[in-house]
Amino acid sequence: PTRRSSDLEAGKASWPTCKLCQARMKKEGLKDVNELQSYLIHRIEVFLNAHGRKLLGWDEILEGGLAPNATVMSWRGTEGGMKAVDSGHMAIMSPGEFCYFDSYQDAPDSQPEAIGGYLPLAKVYSFNPVPDTLSADKVQLVYGVQANLFTEYIPTPEHAEMMIYPRILALAEVAWSDPSVKNYDDFHARALKEVEALKAEGYHPFDLKNEIGNRPGADQPIQHLAVGKKVTYGPDAAYYPGYSAGGDSALVDGVIGGWTYGDKRWQGFIDKKRMDVTIDMEKETEIHSVGADFMQVCGPEVFMPSEVIISVSNDGKEFTELKRMEHKVVKDDKVTFTNFGWEGNAKARYIRYQDRKS
């Protein structure tokens, strides 16, 4: 197949005001720019088919209607692939969450700079490219899986090998194994041996035996006095729905965020929203520390706060400030984590934590 992209490479932002685009839409009876894109992809497919080729496109080609013989590469989750399969088309599952090997595979500060994210070996191995809800007659339309390695941050072949191996071994086993027979502990033991074999052959795989793993507390809950307590958000402090981390209880569930803001464990505040939360301890409580972790990754515009204020109250109305921290945000290419906290002795029922965005 010949793959054609139709997202960043052919953005549609200018099409509504493009005279040529509008003229073509009118001539072909197309109601919107998505249908114009579909018209374009269909014409390309006809050309490719006439030359003995098949068209394979990223899941954006679903917008406006699929070309008759197209295969869909599902990268924004598996939903695009499922839509293709449901309409009788072939699909290749390649979701970013499991198949983008340009993400960090271990603690970012232990690895060469990467594009971001966190995709360890175990996460790759956990991928199921054929959802359980897929009917038996549709399974054959899932053509396979694909790993992707974009090389903006990969300057050498040796670096590329490190990003590929051993994660590609995990994806290969995902592709040929029924989920019922997969066993990560067994695979991990075999992967350790394969890494040594690859080294002996002159390759440069990731040093799996010295893997650090996820952030402490990201996989196993930690205990503290505020776990399970009610959290109230200020009127101008709503978190962004796309980064809810599980909702209003996320900041007191005992589970911290991992190495990536995309792991659904970090709450994000955008636009004019700021973090302003009050925790109700239910009764006057001795408090010795209050803190919250923040992440900064400048590329996708995830920044530290410029100021944090921690205060307490017994009535939920009048608060006494315990600590105010100013922070100079340094914009660089690193993935950094900082805990802004207070330690001391206080007694209160309500704890308020505020930040101001950089």
Each PLM stretch: what is its role?
Residues P1-S5, R356-S358:
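Short, small-residue-biased leader/transition segments that mark boundaries at the very start
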Residues R3-A70, W75-K83:
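Active-site neighborhood of glycoside hydrolase catalytic domains
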Residues D32-L36, A160, V302:
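Extracytoplasmic/periplasmic, Sec-exported soluble proteins
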Residues L48, V72, I168, V290, ...:
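Hydrophobic, well-ordered secondary-structure elements that form the walls
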Residues K54-W58, G65-A70, R76-P221:
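Flexible, acidic glycine-rich loops studded with aromatic residues
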Residues L149, P235, F294, D355-K357:
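Residues that line or immediately flank small-molecule/substrate-binding pockets and catalytic motifs
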Residues R215-I287, M295-M304, R324-K334:
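Disordered, acidic Ser/Thr/Pro-rich linker "stalks" and the adjacent N-terminal cap
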Residues I270-R274, V297-K357:
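Trp- and acidic/polar-enriched beta-sheet ligand-binding modules for extracellular glycan
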